[in-house]
């Protein structure tokens, strides 16, 4: 019996290597290029934003001996355009010396997050109060969603606003944006993205203004997005989970696939 139970648990466990391979193929190499352009060569895929902020290296794979020259090449490319960019890395990426080389070239390391995946075929929907959620799709509503992010994280999120607005205008089915209002004040915002025929949907945002935390708004929007992704027949739901959100999403069945760390360019 114990052996059978152990085998059942083993069989039920997500094959994280396969999931990461699929994610690289469908999400990191095939990116939405609204409010910017996607550029690909044999070494990497990048998104070049129309705004000063918002550009990033999405996928990369090359020999360790080339790391220094490729990093310098990308720095020169974005500097020429006067753009800041993020080099997003995963613990499964090659070459493994990428982090050290980025730091040596003046990049700033951001806080690492857990890249987590939920197999939607194995999750059960939870009931939630739909009446507390407002879906936004126009410039005013999207601005409200971004205002929450700016208050929580600090800084200018205009690039994020422009990206979401452009995505909603040009490919409305690719993104669903949600806000929780309390007395007409936006206090929590989050969005859900779909990428064509990709088996992955992504949950982003998920932030609540400090004085309104502890009311279940994060879980409310999490449950809404799980239900929507499941209803659209998507296979996996992904999140870059901070230490604060990791215990909440773990309870819903999300599993850690990798650690993800962003490095911001020196001119940011």
Spans of features found by a protein language model:
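N-terminal charged segments
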Residues: 2-77, 81, 94
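Acyl-donor-binding surface of acyltransferase catalytic domains
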Residues: 4, 11, 66-132, 137-140, ...
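Helix-loop element at the rim of GNAT/NAT acetyltransferase active sites that forms part
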Residues: 81, 148-159
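A short, well-structured alpha-helix characteristic of acyl/acetyltransferase catalytic modules
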Residues: 139-151
